[in-house]
Curated annotation (Swiss-Prot):
It catalyses: K(+)(in) = K(+)(out). It comes from Gallus gallus. This is Potassium voltage-gated channel subfamily A member 10. One of its GO terms (biological process) is potassium ion transmembrane transport. The N-terminus may be important in determining the rate of inactivation of the channel while the tail may play a role in modulation of channel activity and/or targeting of the channel to specific subcellular compartments. It comes from the Eukaryota. One of its GO terms (cellular component) is voltage-gated potassium channel complex.
Length: 516
């Protein structure tokens, strides 16, 4: 960078005393003293300096040295003021986004030096020296929100005509940081990604990765495969034991043993030797072992019980122990509490069906579906609320439309709730239907209202699903080997070293100063 003395030498070569008379005689300069126009920081412009210089030359008792010294001092002061203004970040920067030019001040970008536009070394890669501007072949509508981030001091807002995934890519490209991305996701209604916690103990960490992260190693994938097979076997057993042939066989054996006045020990022995019970016991042993190991090595016991997957694991093994306890109690109370115990068992055994949700631990698709439903709770709540209003409205209307019909299925408004629900959801079982003209008109309106009501939140839910699906896909693509990470880091360091020799303009970062 040139210092003030270099600027003086250059100006002496351009404006010397040999051509001073030509400048005075130039018709472009008037003889009248024009008011001095102020440049930046209140200093006179170069045109006014030349005009004042002409007056000094024509004045009496003025010599060349006095004229030049005054001009040089005033022009030097002007350059110093311009340089101070440049250092303070008052200069304007032109940013070209795929042909659309934006103009802002350098100090606006310097508020966030860690970003692409705020770091001189990073943005210099996109500088066009011929046009004196920065060129980015990126999405143009998105840059309104990116530039607003700098102008507002860190507030991120997505333009209405820009898709969510496109704007998220722009935030990543301009390196606005994780805080800006988290703020954007929060504004869009997405759930913040939880921080991944790992045990501090090396031994615990290995077992935690083995049982919690199937993609971490081959052994972890093997454990996940065994877990999936056990879950599938458990679900198959749960379904097959309800088949009539197996159920009747067990009931027949139990009746035969009771008629022969067998002892309690024989009854318990018959229950515990049942093939379904044996297979169920083997599955429960694996589930209990898996749950126990994860609880011992987990990094936070509090977070362990807050995880919905761990709660499902606990709930899925409770029915077995309740069944086992009930069978043991029946040894002493065969007649008294047997009916009550059977009722309790039927209810508790129903909980076993929740084991199917254990598959979501090993299925990315089920995890994405769960995240989508969690992020769309507000829309689902609105859907249920609209359906509730429609059910009340149309069940009341169909009741009063069918009240005079002797063979009507709608004897009361609550009886019409079921009909309104299946009609608004376009299921239409046909067990209840209106017969009068007024009732059919109400049914038609109910079906149309149901279609419109259900269609309203569907685009939002689909958008959320696409967001989580693309995010999961991008995370899988970004998984690279440690050797590639080191190679990329070395290339970045080499690239940064090569950038230091560049003399950046238009908001650049001058690293090489001219020696005085």
């Amino acid at each position: 960078m040139m210092d003030v003395s270099s600027w003086k030498e250059m100006e002496v070569a351009l404006v010397s005393f040999d051509n001073a008379d030509q400048i005075v005689e130039d018709p472009c300069y008037s003889n009248d003293l024009s008011p001095a126009s102020q440049s930046r920081k209140g200093h006179p412009s170069c045109a006014n300096l030349l005009s004042n210089w002409r007056i000094l030359i024509n004045s009496e008792n003025a010599n060349n040295e006095t004229i030049f010294s005054r001009f040089s001092a005033e022009f030097s002061e002007h350059l110093v003021g311009e340089r101070v203004g440049m250092e303070e970040g008052d200069q304007r920067v032109i940013i070209n986004i795929a042909g659309l030019r934006f103009e802002t001040r350098l100090k606006t970008l310097n508020q966030f030096p860690e970003t692409l536009l705020g770091d001189p070394e990073k943005r210099m890669r996109y500088f066009d020296s011929m046009r004196n501007e920065y060129f980015f072949d990126r999405n143009r509508p998105s840059f309104d929100g990116i530039l607003y981030y700098y102008q507002s001091g860190g507030k991120i807002r997505r333009p209405a005509n820009v898709p969510i995934d496109v704007f998220a890519d722009e935030i990543t490209f301009y390196e606005l940081g994780d805080e800006a991305m988290d703020q954007f996701r929060e504004d869009e209604g997405f759930i913040k990604d939880p921080e991944t916690l790992l045990p501090t103990n090396d031994f615990h960490r290995q077992f935690w990765l083995l049982f919690e992260y199937p993609e971490s190693s081959s052994a972890a994938r093997g454990v996940a495969l065994v877990s999936v097979l056990v879950i599938v076997i458990s679900i198959i057993i749960f379904c097959m034991e309800t088949l009539p042939e197996f159920r009747e066989e067990r009931e027949y054996k139990s009746t035969q043993e009771l008629s022969k006045n067998t002892t309690d020990t024989l009854l318990a022995h018959s229950t515990f030797t049942d093939p379904f019970f044996v297979i169920e016991t083997a599955c429960i042993i694996w589930f209990s072992f898996e749950l126990f190991v994860r609880f011992i090595v987990c990094p936070s016991k509090t977070e362990f019980f807050k995880n919905i997957m761990n709660i499902i694991d606990i709930v899925s093994i409770i029915p077995y122990f309740v069944t086992l306890t009930t069978e043991l109690i029946q040894q002493s109370e065969l007649n008294g509490q047997q009916n009550m115990s059977l009722a309790i068992l039927r209810i508790i055994r129903l909980v076993r069906v929740f084991r199917i949700f254990k598959l979501s631990r090993h299925s990315k698709g089920l995890q994405i579906l769960g995240q989508t439903l969690k992020a769309s709770m507000r829309e689902l709540g609105l859907l249920i609320f609209f359906l509730f209003i429609g059910v009340i409205l149309f069940s009341s209307a169909v009741y009063f439309a069918e009240v005079d019909e002797p063979q009507s299925h709608f004897s009361s408004i609550p009886d019409g709730f079921w009909w309104a629900v299946v009609t608004m959801t376009t299921v239409g079982y046909g067990d209840m239907c209106p017969t009068t003209l007024g009732g059919k008109i109400v049914g038609t309106l109910c079906a149309i209202a149901g279609v419109l009501t259900i269609a309203l939140p569907v685009p939002v839910i689909v958008s959320n699903f696409n967001y989580f699906y693309h995010r999961e896909t991008e995370n899988e693509e970004k998984q690279i080997l440690p050797g590639e990470v080191e190679r990329i880091l070395n290339s970045v360091v080499t690239g940064n070293d090569s950038m230091e020799s560049l003399n950046k303009t238009n908001g650049g970062y001058p690293r090489d100063k001219a020696k005085k």
